[in-house]
Structure formats: C-alpha cells, structure tokens
Amino acid sequence: MNIQALMQQAQTMQKKVEANVENAKKELGNKEVHAEAGSGLVKVTMTGRHVVKRLTIDPSLLEDEPDMIEDLIAAAINDAVRQADALYEETMAGATSGMGLPPGMQGMF
C-alpha cells in the first residue's frame, strides 16, 4: 500500500468519524435523563447535551428551609449531569465503534 492510498483511507475514515459524531451529538440533544433527590421531592430532566429541560419541586418542600431546597436541587442536577455524561460516553463509543480508534479517542469528540 502506498502512502497516497493510506492518506486517502485516513481521510475517508476521518469524514466517517466526523459524520458519526455529528449524528451522535444530535441524538444526544434529543435524549433525556431523569434524576431526583430527596426521594423524589426534586426532579430534573436534562438532555444528553446537559441542557436542563425541567426542574420540578414538590410543593411541600417550598415550606421548608431554603438551604434544604438548594441542596436537593444541586444533588438532582449533579445526578443528571452524571447520567448525561454516561449517556455521552455510550453514544460516542457507538458512533466511533469499528473505526479502530485507540482507547480514549472518543473523549476527543
């Protein structure tokens, strides 16, 4: 195999990876994760692209201390971020599978 053929193969692979990654990013924007804190008193819905779509606070919680509400909101959002990160890793691994990329390369996208 000559160097020119190797370069063409690399360019073809790069274009395929870029297309797969773009499709995966669109897919992530449409997928949602759901998290909660305080046994469901605070619920968060977030996309795979870390966009918070909905925050629900149980009305009974509004009568309590603001510090507790803030802590539960932070806990629910942090849980949603962890789930969205896992969804991202899973989706990107699928988008780049079969490409022969070295381990850890998916994180570059």
UniProtKB/Swiss-Prot annotation:
GO cellular component: bacterial nucleoid; cytosol
Keywords annotated in UniProt: Cytoplasm, DNA-binding
GO MF, one example: DNA binding
InterPro entries: YbaB-like_sf, YbaB/EbfC
Pfam name, any one: YbaB_DNA_bd
Locations listed in the record: Cytoplasm, Nucleoid
Similarity annotation: Belongs to the YbaB/EbfC family.
Protein name: Nucleoid-associated protein Pcryo_0799
Source species of the chain: Psychrobacter cryohalolentis (strain ATCC BAA-1226 / DSM 17306 / VKM B-2378 / K5)
